[in-house]
Amino acid sequence: MNADRARWNEKFRKSPQPLPSIPLLMYQGRLTKGRALDVAGGLGETSAVLALAGWSVTLVDISDLAVDRARNRARELRADVRVVQADVFRLPFRGPFETIVMTRFIERSIAGQLMRLLAAGGTLFCEQPLTGISKEYCVQPDEFRTLYADLEPVLSTVEGDRAVFIGRKKA
């Protein structure tokens, strides 16, 4: 087992089922319907919200423990979620996805990979803490606008202690 998988398994072993992202619930109407990719989707709360609202969702996470719990949660909720165990550095998808979501996770080095997977006219939703955890995992208020500069900003705001960004890829 690789070190990242072991670290995330340990985190999820101790975690109760989290609540869905409040900003995602608030702003999901601004996202493009169709196929959605939930990057580092963890226990599946974001995927379930999107699936129950009509998206065809694929969740990807490195943790075998998380993907097992996400599958079970989707089954309990009767949410149509395809769950894939994979490393975000080597996403096994061709795309395109009309929506890509990344909540409570940041990996700046995969921005180009996500842009390639995002469909023309598709939306990217990012939510990440500004403070409270290691600086490596926090973002600056407008960092997503810079990181995804090729996207047309639909929303770039701060909700409490979190930066929230929605960007649309040109059609």
Q: What is each model feature region?
A:
Residues 121-131:
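Conserved beta-strand signature within the Rossmann-like core of class I S-adenosyl-L-methionine
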Residues 1-31:
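S-adenosyl-L-methionine
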Residues 70-71:
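Conserved SAM-binding loop
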Residues 63-65:
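Conserved SAM/SAH-binding beta-strand->alpha-helix loop
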Residues 92-99:
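A short acidic, Gly/Pro-enriched loop at the edge of an enzyme's catalytic core
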Residues 77-88:
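Conserved SAM-binding strand-loop segment of SAM-dependent methyltransferases
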Residues 111-123:
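A short glycine-rich, Lys/Arg-flanked "PGG" loop and its adjoining helix->strand segment in the class I
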Residues 34-42:
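Conserved class I S-adenosyl-L-methionine
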